[in-house]
């Protein structure tokens, strides 16, 4: 039976309904500061916590609930005679429900505030109370999520109490929340690239129908702090996103964000199948489509500029899973919405520098994201690339970063005409890309050539310029072939493996 509740919330969503329900059940309500004022102004009978503790709020609100008269009432085990004897002797009344949500550190840490201002949003009293209540969940109901209010109200209406299983679940949510909350604070204070303990702070964004395959369950979690493209996008149309959709959308968006020029990326199974730049969105899309008109079917198309009606009409002619762009003209959106299953995604956040993580059995690999394109670029052949060839070489390196290794991209006039990836040796990747391209001007490789065979193959297809990291013990073989065939070659000094 709940006889006494303590309510202290930052987010006041639904709190009046809960408080008035408790009041109707003759539950005594204790509250603090702004919550006390809010409840009192709305006609709820409430006791100021100072009346309970006999001690005023102090240190600019840092100390309000940190008092034995509060925590003794929360932590006392009701069927422990010694506990009950002690609190009775000390004049402590049991507290049967704790309703608390925390200072919004997750949000405030990203605002334009000083370090000291952000520190003030690190909650101390709230976490202490809810941890205490969660530890003693058999005797105390703890609520930290506004979405749980209604369920608890209904359970009390039906059973006159909250059952042990619900209490346990609510207690588990406390420690789940505190893990994320403390992780965010830890990362804020440490500012270490690779701390001793890796603490991640993610919140469930949505349940997914299934994972990579229908027999795999799945959910999508997003970072509790920061602004990221795959956290802050807006779905304007279409079915719910799937596990594969989100993974593919991430790579497609990162690819187009590589370019200052108007760019389009068509992607399938986490691999670009067509990438192009143009003077207009329509031109970029047309060129990307022409890279591989077969593989684009059922894929994802991403743009780094607003989509216009003409482009939308062309997109609507084929089956696509997703179209993602920074924005859409109103008439373009109307066209795309005619395809009710097509997911139309507005994504304004640019791809960010950060960390990449990969799970292995029993561990997580963490690395800095691959954000450096070139380093110490130098021409290593007798012939140098033309200005246009150099533009295409840089374009090719931007694309090849997002192709599974071993990866080769063949480019002509800002268009990835052939993409070969996921091969266990480089010559196979080169043959795949060259064969798909049919014709091309330049070739980009994600890693060095171990032998001269890739340069030989490129020459057969009329390639005029090559860009690669260099660094092989047999670099001279490739340089010799290029000089003999009249091909220019550029070394970048930066490898772009993608596994």
From Swiss-Prot:
Its EC number is 2.1.2.3, 3.5.4.10. GO terms for cellular component: cytosol. GO terms for biological process: 'de novo' IMP biosynthetic process. Keywords: Hydrolase, Multifunctional enzyme, Purine biosynthesis, Transferase. Pathway: Purine metabolism; IMP biosynthesis via de novo pathway; 5-formamido-1-(5-phospho-D-ribosyl)imidazole-4-carboxamide from 5-amino-1-(5-phospho-D-ribosyl)imidazole-4-carboxamide (10-formyl THF route): step 1/1; Purine metabolism; IMP biosynthesis via de novo pathway; IMP from 5-formamido-1-(5-phospho-D-ribosyl)imidazole-4-carboxamide: step 1/1. Residues 1-144 form the MGS-like domain. One of its GO terms (molecular function) is phosphoribosylaminoimidazolecarboxamide formyltransferase activity. It catalyses: (6R)-10-formyltetrahydrofolate + 5-amino-1-(5-phospho-beta-D-ribosyl)imidazole-4-carboxamide = 5-formamido-1-(5-phospho-D-ribosyl)imidazole-4-carboxamide + (6S)-5,6,7,8-tetrahydrofolate; IMP + H2O = 5-formamido-1-(5-phospho-D-ribosyl)imidazole-4-carboxamide. PANTHER family: BIFUNCTIONAL PURINE BIOSYNTHESIS PROTEIN ATIC, BIFUNCTIONAL PURINE BIOSYNTHESIS PROTEIN PURH. Belongs to the PurH family. This is Bifunctional purine biosynthesis protein PurH. The IMP cyclohydrolase activity resides in the N-terminal region.
